[in-house]
Amino acid sequence: MHLERDKVYDAPEGEVWSTVKPASTHNSAAPKRLAQRWNHRWSDESLTQGVSPLKDSSKTVKASTTIPLGTGRPTALYYPWQSVSMAGTEASRQPRGLKPTLAGNMTCSKGEAAFDLSSALNYGEPSGWSQLVAFFRETTGRVHRPPYADWDTTLTCGSTSAVDLVLRMFCNRGDCVLAERFTYPGTLMASRAQGLRTVGIAMDADGLVPEALDAALRGWDAASRGRKPFVLYTIPSGHNPTGVTQSAARKRAVYQVAERHDLLIVEDDPYFFLRLGRGGGGESLPTSYLSLDTAGRVVRVESTSKILAPGLRCGWLTASRQVVDMFGNFAEVGPSSPAGPSQAMLYKLLVESWGPEGFAGWLDYLSGEYGRRRDVMVAACERHLPREVCAWTAPTHGMFLWVGAALERHPRYQESGARDQDRDADADAELCRAVEDGICARAEANGVLVARGSWCRVGGGADRAFFRMTFVATAEAADLERGVAQFGRAVRDEFGLG
């Protein structure tokens, strides 16, 4: 089976994604508009980026009668693998908490009609193997229902790689990128490596604050700060590191600001499917920016890392056809596509074994397991963390708990004697780092690792020390209790609470 680009995976009839609340109000009977063009926003690198002539010419080597003397692809006769076998998990829609059972073996062989191992071991298309792309395109269409006509989906080598390429596509050295006040450190590192500056936008309990975003753009001084930023990077569900999930109303307000200032929204959403509920139960999937996007100004980035396995190094990206095509040009001379064996594993599991129903069932199961672990960690925090110093909010999506420690309760802060209006911001930032270092050193000495909030902070200033704790990384849920207890002891020692 080889599906052409514009075709979709032939999913079974029935509503698989029954927990999805459609965000788009677009009349499905009315024609959808085409996405806006982004020629005015391409980076200098994009303007000089073309299609690799060697790789482009190899696409024509399809017919068995063609003698491929111009390619650099060795014949499959000399690949030492004849077949690859794997055992997967049986997943279906079932009561939450019921552990999936072991499924039968899945085999990918040379010459196989559905997914030829010879093809998986050869150079692949930058967009990924069509059968697998079709599955993710179909999933995207059913879940998000993009309300414009010319959207498309491509595979990526994971979210970090995808975001790095998107920044290269739109930004020049010296440009500024907008992001939440706290954000994923990998994106901060990628931005710095490209010579970009990240501008932090205020957050509240619903995530990114649209009024703060609008104010930052309205008051932008191009003479002193360079050209006005037009790329907004956001992690809307189970935000890394804060755990916050943006409400549908919040996303609509942010999207309106994006329309007003002609922003491109990079929606990095690896935790979208991990809905934990407020008491261990499931919730509907969040409204996505993609589902609100009527003009093709959203680049949605998703990943298999948090829902299947990080080592697959595979994700998928959805955007307008123009943006997806440019992404493919960058991928051809960069990371290319995910490794063929990874794609074969995904195809055998998602398409041949699970299908959409099984995939949805697996995500239900995973969400239930993560929700229970979240509850264990939150309960441990209630028992072991000093409330007079620490604050946290149980996340409804994702895998992180964000704990803040009030600096004004620290002995060094109180010893300074300065009133709030007289405090030195640099001194407070230094104290914040010292408190983080002290707590982390004590915790590590007792065998517990937590992530420092300063690694995720955009810009300076601090009135709290923050720590990110993951509740899905331990093999045993009981380790969460012991880990939080040791972390709580480290906080008490650092703040002199005995």
UniProtKB/Swiss-Prot annotation:
A GO term for molecular function: aromatic-amino-acid transaminase activity
Enzyme class: transferase
The UniProt record lists the keyword Oxidoreductase: no
Alphabetical list of Pfam families matching this protein: Aminotran_1_2
Deleted gene: phenotype: Impairs the production of 1-oxoindolizidine, (1S)-1-hydroxyindolizin, and (1R)-1-hydroxyindolizine and completely abolishes the production of swainsonine.
UniProt cross-references to InterPro entries, sorted A to Z: Aminotransferase_I/II_large, Class-I_PLP-dep_aminotransf, PyrdxlP-dep_Trfase, PyrdxlP-dep_Trfase_major
Keywords: Aminotransferase, Pyridoxal phosphate, Transferase
Cofactor: pyridoxal 5'-phosphate
Gene Ontology biological process terms in this record: aromatic amino acid family catabolic process; lysine biosynthetic process via aminoadipic acid; tyrosine biosynthetic process
Pathway: Mycotoxin biosynthesis
Functional summary from the UniProt entry: Aminotransferase; part of the gene cluster that mediates the biosynthesis of swainsonine (SW), a cytotoxic fungal alkaloid and a potential cancer therapy drug. Swainsonine production occurs via a multibranched pathway and is dispensable for fungal colonization of plants and infection of insect hosts. The first step of swainsonine biosynthesis is the production of the precursor pipecolic acid (PA) via conversion of L-lysine (Lys) to 1-piperideine-6-carboxylate (P6C) by the aminotransferase swnA, the latter being further reduced to PA by the reductase swnR.
UniProt-listed PANTHER family: AMINOTRANSFERASE, AROMATIC_AMINOADIPATE AMINOTRANSFERASE 1
Family statement drawn from the similarity comment of this UniProt entry: Belongs to the class-I pyridoxal-phosphate-dependent aminotransferase family.
UniProt name for this protein: Aminotransferase swnA
Native source organism of the sequence: Metarhizium robertsii (strain ARSEF 23 / ATCC MYA-3075) (Metarhizium anisopliae (strain ARSEF 23))
